[in-house]
């Protein structure tokens, strides 16, 4: 698995330390192990997880601006855990409303000694503790849903980062909240079939 991760990182032009690579592989092993009982992801094969979960998250890293981020509807920690491993200088809050997912994330943080992540069990509409430089999500079906639930979470200069598949601009036209498109970035995820986009929005 280490060799495959090394190849994927080279293809994506991402540089990580050996320690960071070990943490990413450790995360995949834990996700695979816990998935059998907790049903955390539909992806069953660990090597497939490297592409569909790890690389799909890591390619966002270069586009993040700021120091504080919240991953809304993080599920088993995606994209938050890979991004936190790749960016130990940034702080991440991982928010989910399902207890089993937060329990899993807490175990990951303990076993892999990740210190820049705060897991929070909450529904997004009930979380008002603070604001962030960036609001991350790959969980929402539509940009309109994301903005309806998360509109108060970015600070004055903060941005929304939505991970999407195919993007043609029509989804943005359905958004009710006042918002501006900062960028629509086509992502290169090595060995992933299908399009991926990062939609960056600001109030």
From Swiss-Prot:
GO molecular function: rRNA (guanine-N7-)-methyltransferase activity
EC annotation from Swiss-Prot or TrEMBL: 2.1.1.170
Enzyme class, first EC level, given as a word: transferase
Keywords: Cytoplasm, Methyltransferase, rRNA processing, S-adenosyl-L-methionine, Transferase
Record-linked Pfam families: GidB
Binding site for S-adenosyl-L-methionine: 73, 78, 124-125, 138
Superkingdom per UniProt: Bacteria
Keyword Transferase on entry: yes
InterPro entries attached to this UniProt entry: rRNA_ssu_MeTfrase_G (IPR003682), SAM-dependent_MTases_sf (IPR029063)
Catalysed transformations (reactions): guanosine(527) in 16S rRNA + S-adenosyl-L-methionine = N(7)-methylguanosine(527) in 16S rRNA + S-adenosyl-L-homocysteine
The keyword Metal-binding belongs to this UniProt entry's keyword annotation: no
Subcellular localization, as worded in the UniProt entry: Cytoplasm
GO cellular component labels: cytosol
PANTHER family: S-ADENOSYL-L-METHIONINE-DEPENDENT METHYLTRANSFERASES SUPERFAMILY PROTEIN (PTHR31760:SF0)
Family: Belongs to the methyltransferase superfamily. RNA methyltransferase RsmG family.
Record's function text: Specifically methylates the N7 position of guanine in position 527 of 16S rRNA.
This protein's name: Ribosomal RNA small subunit methyltransferase G
Gene: rsmG
